[in-house]
Amino acid sequence: MDNKTIRSYGEQALRDEAQAILDQIQYMDDNFEKAVDMMFHCQGKIIVTGVGKSGHVGAKIAATLASTGTPAFYINPLDVYHGDLGVMTDKDVVLALSNSGQTDELLRFIPMVLHMNIPIISITGNPDSLLAKYSNHHITVKVKKEACPLNLAPTSSTTAALATGDALAIALMQVRHFKPRDFAQFHPGGELGKRLLTTAEDVMRSDDMPIIPKEMHLGE
């Protein structure tokens, strides 16, 4: 197999995933706006959840939200059976991800969320799924096909879900009027944080400065 053929495989995968993201624009409706509004007015935290690849995507979405002004963290729905349910309160909002909207582990978690009167926003590829029906607001993320040549491995679908999570985070940033200095507050170790937050006093050395008395001779 020549290098040109191998490169064409990669190029096609990128085209498929790029198109999958662009296709999501057609599904943008007032549910997206309502989801952003609910997250903006949340008095607690955004609890992002999902299983498998959706869980990995959810963890990244939670990290992006948290670093851009919206308190959030990821929770594995399997862990709630072993004490993690204690981190949740009725002031929170759950953001649940599932391509099918029918993931068993996630659906077993949802009744607990409803019992605690916690509102649910879901991102799925099936607006008629049980998860969508349980949700206060549902955002459809549907792809025509996966970038995987077998149309099996989650590729285009996870990319589209991740991009939709970024869209939520970016919309929230703009609603909050999030500024570079706000960003720096959450990234004190990054280059931007150091540049915006470091003052002259932080780097100035005053206690051990070598001071030469004026009466001292050059030879000394």
Residue spans of the language-model regions?
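Conserved Rossmann-fold dehydrogenase catalytic segment
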Residues: 149-150, 187-192
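An N-terminal, well-structured beta->alpha segment
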Residues: 2-44
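Short, glycine-rich nucleotide/cofactor-binding loops
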Residues: 18-28, 96-102, 212-215
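Short acidic active-site motifs
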Residues: 31-35, 80-84, 220
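Bateman/CBS regulatory modules and CBS-like beta-alpha motifs in cytosolic regions of diverse proteins
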Residues: 194-220
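Alpha-helical scaffold segments in soluble metabolic enzymes
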Residues: 16, 23, 34, 38-41, ...
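Long, charge-dense, solvent-exposed interaction surfaces that engage phosphate-rich ligands
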Residues: 167-174, 178-189
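Glycine-rich phosphate-binding loops that contact phosphosugars or nucleotide phosphates
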Residues: 44-163, 169-173
